[in-house]
Amino acid sequence: MNSLLIEREMIMLYHYLKENYIPGEPIFTGDIDIPGMTEENLRYHLKRLTDSGAICRFEPGVYYFPKTDIFGERMSLSPDTVAVHKYIMRRGKRVGYYSGYTLANRMGLSTQVPFIQEISSNFAPALVRKMKIKNRQYIIRRPVVEVTEENVSVLQFLDSLKDIEKCTEMELEKCGKILTEFARKNSITKKKIDRFITKYPIKIYKAIYETEVEYVSS
């Protein structure tokens, strides 16, 4: 490939990135789709753009346009931002949610703040795996079904019940009230629950009974 074509291809990549990503949003090389551009050329152009200062490299396979602070200094991405974009909201599409102890804390079912965040994601590389993003560790789990914007609240509700004994230090009746309010706020009906509850361990029925949780009847 001659130098003119190489330059054109790099400019095309730069415009593609500018049109599809905002400052502070992780760019995963696996998500870049430019017809005719090989993986080898993509890596080459990303390196050139990084060397020129047009974009920044967070870690292998992850780049970004940096935000600037009030002093005009470039701000680096945080591991949590990368984790959210990689495993929870990928290119604006719901692909996962916080789970386990992290979910219990975010739902108000526990006051404990877990050191390692847990996420259930369609992009989980295995059934359960501990992953490291820079200096932070995450537990990534495969969900019982594919996560979508339509079913995420039901899965969070059922996950919370499944892990209720393990993840909360509160009285179960109080947990039931919190989950009942969550169910009402998110219009979680028995019909929606019945679609997924058989994917969960049988102990979930015990949790429903003991918490006296209620959900929308229809």
Give the ranges of each region predicted by the language model.
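Short, Lys/Arg-enriched N-terminal segments with co-localized hydrophobic residues
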Residues: M1-I11
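Short beta-edge/loop segments at beta->alpha junctions of small alpha/beta modules
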Residues: M10-I88
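Short coil/loop linkers at secondary-structure junctions
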Residues: T38, L109-S110, K134, K203
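Alpha-helix N-cap/helix-initiation sites
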Residues: E39, R43, C56, G96-Y97, ...
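Short gly/ser-rich loop at a beta-strand->alpha-helix junction or flexible surface loop bordering the NTP-binding
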Residues: F58-V62, M89-R129
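Short, surface-exposed loop/turn motifs that are enriched in glycine and acidic residues
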Residues: R74, M89-K93, V147
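A short, charged helix-loop
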Residues: K132-R142
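Hydrophobic alpha-helical interaction segments
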Residues: P143-S218
